[in-house]
Amino acid sequence: MPISWWKALAFLLLGAGPAAAQQVKLPPGAIRWSASRPLVVADFKGRPKTSQGHAALTSANINTGATCRGNVFAGTAQASFDPASSWVREPGSMTPALLRHEQLHFDIAEVYARRLRQQLAAMHTTCDRLGGTFDRISQAAYTAWQQAEDDYDRDTNHGLQHERQARWETQVHQQLRELAAFAEKDA
């Protein structure tokens, strides 16, 4: 269902070299997106919000990081899932369809993390010329991601429109394949 939009731009200007930008330090307990590790019902550990009538909520994020070494900029992004903020109203009655809907929220976050990695890889700039470019590119990615998540819930009626849900699944999986060159090596 809806995504919790907690955003943490983790600026890791540590001077540790471009390789350090390949791994972003995630918040404690966060689950890093991985094609080999789909979400399971037990991952949804948060308490349901009584004010929301949704059956479940996925709290995903795109964490960003940057390094400078020898005045050379390198940046990356990583999709993550926050179990403590994600919930399912009645875990015993979570259907496979609902779990697929929630997984696709996480998959959409990964699509936008890959798009951001693609943009960051194309930024051939020095750190002293970086200015607010990293912030602007990251914020634009977050905005586009949020819009896609909202469109997904609206178009599928939170997964209740099965035909539209199937179409979104096909589209998102195709986008993941198209952006495979920007997947993390062990994701």
Q: Model-flagged regions — what are they?
A:
Residues 11-13:
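Gram-negative bacterial Sec-dependent N-terminal signal peptides
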Residues 80-117:
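Mid-length scaffold segments of soluble, non-membrane domains
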Residues 17-21:
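Sec/Tat signal peptide C-region and signal peptidase I cleavage site
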Residues 1-9:
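Bacterial N-terminal signal peptides that target proteins for export
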Residues 89-91, 122, 127:
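Substrate-binding clefts and substrate-entry loops adjacent to catalytic sites
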Residues 22, 98-100, 104-107, 123, ...:
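Structured catalytic/translocation cores of nucleotide/phosphate-coupled proteins
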Residues 24-81, 124-187:
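Metalloprotease/metallohydrolase-associated module, dominated by Zn2+-dependent proteases
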